[in-house]
Amino acid sequence: MVVSVALRDYGPLTVACARTTLGAVALVLLMRVMGRRFPLGDRGLWPYLGAIGLLSTALPFFLLSWGQQYVPSAFAGISMAALPLFVLPLAHVFADEPLTLRRSAGVIVGFVGAAVLIGPGVFAGGGDMAAWGQLACVGAAMSYAVAAILTRRCPPIDPIALSTLTLVVGSVALIPLMLAIEGVPGWAGQTTGLAILF
């Protein structure tokens, strides 16, 4: 809902960038207050941090912001609710977690339930951009699912440090794109300005 309000006056890259950057700043400050250190010397972590940062922050935040220009917030929410349905099959292939008959049945029931919640007419009407918006929201859920699998395979790291560094990676990826495509954002008014801050 807040994203939809922010999109009234800001572009999707700006909204996504605000989410990652403000979150990164807040967590960096929290790390400092708690006296925790970042494992910057562990080179084995950085490929994971880079991939998780892109797939859990930069890409899904942008896809959700872009998609919500054309679809209701409810669709984006339902897409996120379907996240476990993507994680289970991926975990079977990449995380050595067998997809048993019971889990398979759960996935099928989950997909059916999501389809019922979304409704039969969700893909009807709205033009081509609505369909692309729906695909963007589903793509964001899939991106989160892949990031979840990578997080399971990631070497041990402080959870707060992991969250902080992945948001930093997302910010580093999004800021140049935002500046190049949408420019430096300004204060667009109290309603959308506060929405983008939250």
Tell what function each PLM region has:
Residues 24-52, 65, 69-70, 93-105, ...:
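Membrane-interface interhelical linkers
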Residues 27, 90, 99-121, 140-144, ...:
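Hydrophobic transmembrane alpha-helices of multi-pass small-molecule transport proteins
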Residues 14-25, 55-56, 61-98, 103-104, ...:
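Specific alpha-helical transmembrane segments that line the substrate/conduction pathway
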Residues 1-18, 66, 123-153, 172-174, ...:
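Glycine-/small-residue-enriched transmembrane alpha-helix faces in small-molecule transporters
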Residues 1, 28, 32, 62, ...:
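Residue-level hotspots within transmembrane alpha-helices of multi-pass secondary transporters
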Residues 17-22, 47, 51, 55, ...:
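Hydrophobic residues within alpha-helical transmembrane segments
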Residues 52-61, 83-84, 118, 140-145, ...:
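Transmembrane alpha-helical core positions of polytopic small-molecule transporters
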Residues 15, 159-163:
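Juxtamembrane helix-start motifs in multi-pass secondary transporters
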